[in-house]
């Protein structure tokens, strides 16, 4: 039988525990401490838990909505190659780029001269008051080559400049193409639609030679819209004069004024370290200068908010015929170059190539005994370090020189024969902060003397500084090249070149073409040219390295 104590404990367990606690009073505080040490769930902690899970589910819901319910915008389907032909036409040496249809792919603008446009639905020469043939401006899609808009703009074009939109919401006036006709027409058309923004006759007569380029100066017409105003230089006899026009309305500001120089060649607008603007112009064997402030006061008769540089004014006042530099030889090219504290000047003459300090015009370096064939271009041979490309020598004896812009030292050189009047070189920034360079030359780099000019083809070569002993021949072109540029149609992913071809003489119309080729599509079928010993990679491995190049926009 069960003991009485055990039976009582089974029937009254709590009572039994009370007896044990009375028998062992020393154990009581320890048990109370254990009870106190156990955390008690609070209302605050429960609220925090609820808030955490609520936030988590909200984030997951938003991700779900954005990923599956709201459709992503369609990326434009970009064709690797497209071509547009015009019969019985003449092509102008002009190319411009910008996102016209706002599909985030750069589109192409160009000029050609023809009896009528390619699209029968667009306006004819007669619709705009021109006789045939006349000049048309055309905007085509960079993605597929379709015509976005096309219209006649002048009887014949002397100057054209397009102000590209900086943002997607840029207004029409600040995003326009300005066209100066040889017969006195002066028109601005919308960059996006081709519609006329304003049109006026210019103040230049038919016997005046209009000098390039069309210069832009800060907004001075007092309308306060911030649109840059326009400066056109013209030469009549030996005298150079200038006229200012409002960029927003096209109306002339004041009257024409003489610069007091007998300049010739291409003008340049230069900004000194003090912010003063000067018009630089080759004149005989010298470099002449004239301040924008003086020109504005001369043509309007009132003071402007422009600056004059005391150092430059002192040089001009102590010179004859406003000459800044003397005994230079024939000035062929003049360029503004980014410097450490502002703009420097790259001056190319018949005798030398000189980098001048942009303030005191002292030489930083000189490359003598050169015969520069074409206008220099800039690129990056080393990461984030500017280099300048010089094409030295005659066409058959041409040599490509890459110079360090800060010192003038030669970084890379390569003989590359070309045809007379060949297209210029260009460069594209790559993701490694260097540049891919594109040069035109002859297909056969060795036996050029045995070729007849009609049988010779232009070849496009690609070079990257990470492979200094390699040239990649991308394409061959037998037609006459009017204009060329390598461009980034889409950020980081769509490098291409655009080519304008047509008759060599503007007096003989013929077939003209606009062609786009994606660079990456040309690399697999390219020809690898080894310039010397040192590369152990196979041709296919080299092509693969060029295919992996990624491009970036220059800031």
Curated annotation (Swiss-Prot):
GO CC term, one of those recorded: membrane
Glycosylation sites: 116, 120, 317, 392, 476
InterPro entries in UniProt: FAM234, FAM234A_B_beta-prop, Quinoprotein_ADH-like_sf
Keywords of the record: Glycoprotein, Membrane, Phosphoprotein, Signal-anchor, Transmembrane, Transmembrane helix
Family as reported in the entry's similarity comment: Belongs to the FAM234 family.
Transmembrane segments: 50-70
Subcellular location: Membrane
Organism this protein belongs to: Mus musculus (Mouse)
Cytoplasmic side: 1-49
Modified residues (Phosphoserine): 21
UniProt name for this protein: Protein FAM234A
Origin superkingdom: Eukaryota
Annotated segments matching region Disordered: 1-40
Keyword check for Nucleotidyltransferase: no
């Amino acid at each position: 039988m069960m003991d009485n104590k055990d039976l009582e404990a089974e029937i009254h367990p709590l009572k039994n525990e009370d007896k044990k606690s009375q028998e062992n009073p020393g154990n009581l505080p320890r048990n109370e401490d254990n009870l106190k040490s156990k955390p008690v769930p609070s209302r605050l902690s429960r609220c925090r838990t609820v808030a955490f899970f609520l936030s988590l589910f909200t984030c997951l819901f938003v991700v779900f909505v954005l990923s599956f319910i709201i459709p992503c915008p369609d990326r434009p389907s970009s064709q690797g190659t497209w071509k547009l032909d015009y019969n019985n036409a003449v092509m102008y040496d002009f190319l411009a780029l910008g996102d016209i249809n706002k599909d985030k792919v750069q589109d192409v603008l160009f000029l050609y001269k023809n009896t009528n446009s390619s699209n029968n639905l667009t306006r004819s020469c007669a619709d705009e008051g021109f006789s045939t043939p006349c000049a048309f401006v055309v905007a085509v899609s960079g993605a597929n080559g379709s015509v976005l808009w096309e219209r006649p703009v002048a009887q014949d074009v002397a100057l054209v400049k397009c102000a590209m939109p900086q943002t997607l919401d840029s207004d029409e006036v600040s995003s326009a193409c300005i066209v100066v006709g040889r017969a006195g027409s002066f028109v601005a058309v919308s960059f996006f639609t081709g519609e006329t923004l304003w049109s006026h006759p210019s103040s230049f007569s038919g016997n005046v030679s209009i000098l390039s380029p069309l210069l832009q100066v800060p907004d001075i017409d007092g309308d306060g819209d911030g649109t840059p105003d326009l400066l056109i230089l013209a030469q009549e006899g030996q005298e150079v004069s200038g006229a200012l026009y409002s960029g927003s309305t096209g109306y002339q500001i004041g009257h024409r004024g003489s610069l007091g120089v007998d300049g010739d060649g291409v003008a340049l607008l230069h900004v000194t370290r003090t912010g003063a603007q000067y018009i630089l112009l080759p004149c005989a064997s010298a470099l002449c200068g004239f301040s924008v402030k003086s020109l504005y006061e001369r043509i309007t008769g009132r003071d402007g908010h422009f600056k004059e540089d005391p150092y430059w004014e002192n040089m001009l006042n102590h010179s004859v015929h406003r000459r800044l530099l003397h005994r230079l030889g024939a000035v062929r090219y003049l360029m503004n170059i980014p410097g450490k504290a502002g703009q420097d000047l790259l001056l190319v003459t018949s005798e030398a190539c000189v980098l001048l300090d942009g303030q005191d015009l002292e030489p930083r370096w000189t490359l003598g005994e050169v015969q520069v064939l074409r206008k220099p271009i800039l690129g990056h041979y080393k990461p984030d370090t500017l280099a300048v490309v010089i094409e030295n020598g005659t066409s058959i004896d041409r040599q490509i020189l890459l110079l360090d812009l800060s010192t003038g030292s030669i970084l890379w050189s390569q003989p590359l024969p070309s045809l007379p009047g060949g297209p210029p070189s260009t460069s594209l920034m790559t993701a490694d902060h260097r540049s891919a360079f594109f040069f035109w030359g002859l297909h056969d780099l060795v036996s050029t003397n045995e070729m007849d000019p009609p049988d010779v083809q232009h070849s496009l070569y690609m070079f990257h500084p990470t492979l200094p002993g390699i040239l990649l021949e991308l394409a061959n072109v037998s037609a006459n090249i009017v204009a060329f540029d390598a461009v980034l149609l889409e950020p980081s992913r769509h490098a291409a070149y655009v080519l304008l071809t047509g008759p060599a003489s503007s007096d003989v119309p013929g077939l003209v073409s606009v062609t786009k080729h994606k660079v990456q599509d040309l690399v697999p079928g390219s020809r690898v040219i080894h310039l010397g010993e040192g590369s152990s990679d196979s041709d296919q491995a080299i092509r693969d390295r060029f295919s992996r190049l990624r491009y970036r926009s220059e800031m």
